[in-house]
Design a protein with these regions (language model features):
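Conserved PLP phosphate-binding loop immediately N-terminal to the Schiff-base lysine helix
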Residues: 1-35
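Active-site region of PLP-dependent enzymes
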Residues: 21-127
């Protein structure tokens, strides 16, 4: 199946939108994965974000990005029950993103060709 800008992973609500850039482009009731890798429209060198309108998913993803910890509870007071990945964006990278955002909004995004980017659905880890 060909795709343009984004695609859903299998029968899930997870969207690979790594090359997608569009005002008000969020698709409701999804986990929309964005990339800020150096080739992307909002180029921060690395990192990304997952957009969601599901509060429960947001809370779980936030914990996962902080090594499975709740960022609002002191480390010593927690009994971790969630797998964590240490994937939070540093304040410096977030600040750079805010600096670059006005220009990114005004700039026409690159149109990616399907052959330029791997389709995650073809990778064993997602099968």
């Amino acid at each position: 199946e060909d795709w343009s800008d984004f695609y859903f992973l299998g029968g899930t609500t997870i969207i690979d939108a790594a090359v997608f850039w569009k005002r008000n482009g969020y698709i409701r009731r999804s986990l929309m994965c964005l990339s800020f890798q150096f080739q992307k429209h909002l180029s921060l060198g690395r990192g990304g974000m997952i957009l969601t309108d599901d509060k429960e998913a947001r809370d779980e993803l936030k914990k996962m990005s902080y090594d499975g910890r709740d960022p609002d509870i002191p480390w010593r007071d927690q009994n971790i029950s969630t797998i964590g990945y240490h994937y939070y964006m540093t304040p410096e990278t977030a600040s750079l993103g805010l600096e670059k955002l006005p220009k990114a909004i005004k700039t026409e995004p690159r149109v990616w060709d399907i052959e330029e980017w791997p389709d995650l659905r073809d990778m064993d880890v997602f099968k």
